[in-house]
Amino acid sequence: MERIKELRDLMSQSRTREILTKTTVDHMAIIKKYTSGRQEKNPALRMKWMMAMKYPITADKRIMEMIPERNEQGQMLWSKANDAGSDRVMVSPLAVTWWNRNGPTTSTVHYPKVYKTYFEKVERLKHGTFGPVHFRNQVKIRRRVDINPGHADLSAKEAQDVIMEVVFPNEVGARILTSESQLTITKEKKEELQDCKIAPLMVAYMLERELVRKTRFLPVAGGTSSVYIEVLHLTQGTCWEQMYTPGGEVRNDDVDQSLIIAARNIVRRATVSADPLASLLEMCHSTQIGGIRMVDILRQNPTEEQAVDICKAAMGLRISSSFSFGGFTFKRTSGSSVKKEEEVLTGNLQTLKIRVHEGYEEFTMVGRRATAILRKATRRLIQLIVSGRDEQSIAEAIIVAMVFSQEDCMIKAVRGDLNFVNRANQRLNPMHQLLRHFQKDAKLLFQNWGIEPIDNVMGMIGILPDMTPSTEMSLRGVRVSKMGVDEYSSTERVVVSIDRFLRVRDQRGNVLLSPEEVSETQGTEKLTITYSSSMMWEINGPESVLVNTYQWIIRNWETVKIQWSQDPTMLYNKMEFEPFQSLVPKAARGQYSGFVRTLFQQMRDVLGTFDTVQIIKLLPFAAAPPEQSRMQFSSLTVNVRGSGMRILVRGNSPVFNYNKATKRLTVLGKDAGALTEDPDEGTAGVESAVLRGFLILGKEDKRYGPALSINELSNLAKGEKANVLIGQGDVVLVMKRKRDSSILTDSQTATKRIRMAIN
């Protein structure tokens, strides 16, 4: 206050004002500072005093023909005096206004296309909803966030090639456009920007915004997707937050979100298959997200999430060197340790073999809703500083840190046996056993941990075993802080290896990730995820399995047909039939399979009894291990729509319906595709007749006249005999049965008798 008063007094004397306004600045150092170099030292000031002049702008001489000397108000727009040192004209800012209002117009069609990201941002803000402002302490942590909504995910190099090809197509230089997305974008942009008059450099900058993901390491409390980050300055201050709902979604956020869901589903499914790694790769390669191959997205998308990183590791891509435990990302910030196997006893006297980290280490722990700093020694937690959104989140972080510390009092707090299993029914490793146990109920853990009196430190308070805050006491070594812990900022990626059980290790052999770390949270993807792999058919329930199985057979009918006749065992073992087995009642699987395989064998033995529709219909049932039995079935049951539905062995049913006229198959009312029957099927060789109600008597008997064709055969009366031409030009004598008997026995005897008759 004193100094302000003093200054006021000085300013009231006219002499002071005169000195300040009239004295020239002739101190050499100051002149040097403001005049050396081309760089403007004080742009704001420069702009102010330039705009205060009458003609602060220079323009090409042609402007004198294009703009009148005075505007409608009679104000001068340009001066006849030349600009010193160039042959340009001095122009008033009013000339710009005149030009904007009355100057020539150009086509604006390209503006929304070039400045697409800006136009879209305006739309999002227009339709967004800003809610109330709340004043409260903001726990912000720095996270790496995507700052430019609506971009594709090209690498800088890929984008550069696309931009050069679109904006400067005639420039020299090798440009290789290889990826599908590069080619699509290039084609699209070239069409959009035909005859575009906007400066090429500007177009290039704008394209870069659209093609490349830009990330920054920013303090954030709340939403981290790019549509929230673009309004970060409006939604969170140091002590306030403003509620906001974006007025639109952008594809890049949708891709990130859908990628995480697809990766989680794939890892979960792979875990329960016979060879998890092979299955995972097969699924990643055959899945599309929003019409783009998942493997292409994985190569370009920097999202760090446990399931996504497992998929990346399987593809041989580098991932972040931090490791995951209990849903938190751990990054060691100092110290080191060696690992030793050690046997410990739980409170229930169960022996656990754990890998103990010997040595002093410090870690940052970052989760979705809580963060912490952890200092630990061998099997001892020294200090844990936690911050989180709420009591629940803080408790989660404390449990994970206590288990990670491997302290004896934690292991002794276990009551009951530890026998948690994963999706494939395998026991979890001891550390995850402990974690699951305490995540279910941590009361004893907190009570046994011990408490200590605390010093009053700014911004820190204690937390009691019942998770209530306190300023006097706290769980031993644990403090709650108002400040969050920043996420690990480095984008460094390391080479990792993955074993067939999807455990990811760094080059020193430390486990960074395992399927146990993959979140069980279910979400609905924003973009369509198309899993072509049969392993993922069951994700949408039994109906989807049924439809997909039949669609697969129809799509691959040409190969299936050959395998059916030449190598049926290989066909029955195809993994595409695996999901179908879950629909067949357990007790009937083996019997159905035995029955269908026998039926198929007869079709193969008796030439010409090939029946496309029937083979397709029954094929999935033949995949189960067969039981030899004399059982015959007229219908087979599948469990869909909450009950058993029947598939008729001969004929249509709501489950499996083939329309001969349209040649289309519907499964549960859904179209499953078009069938191409064999050309000779309608008039199938005589064997189908032999199969259905004829008895083979032996070799050709000339007394019964010339060999008949199949059509003539159908005119025989019961008990009548005839010679019939079969298969490879052989002729046999048959008799029409006196009664309609079992088709199956017919086919079995027919097979044997044809062989005998021919030989």
From Swiss-Prot:
A motif (Nuclear localization signal) lies at residues 736-739. Transmembrane segments: none annotated. It comes from the Viruses. It is found in: Virion; Host nucleus. GO terms for molecular function: RNA binding; RNA-directed RNA polymerase activity. Keywords: Cap snatching, Eukaryotic host gene expression shutoff by virus, Eukaryotic host transcription shutoff by virus, Host gene expression shutoff by virus, Host nucleus, Host-virus interaction, Inhibition of host RNA polymerase II by virus, mRNA capping, mRNA processing, Viral transcription, Virion. The record marks 627 as: Avian adaptation. InterPro entries: Flu_PB2_2nd, Flu_PB2_6th, Flu_PB2_C, Flu_PB2_CAP-bd, Flu_PB2_middle, Flu_PB2_N, INV_PB2, PB2_helical. Influenza RNA polymerase is composed of three subunits: PB1, PB2 and PA. Interacts (via N-terminus) with PB1 (via C-terminus). Interacts with nucleoprotein NP (via N-terminus). Belongs to the influenza viruses PB2 family. This is Polymerase basic protein 2. The lineage of its organism: Viruses, Riboviria, Orthornavirae, Negarnaviricota, Polyploviricotina. The gene is PB2.
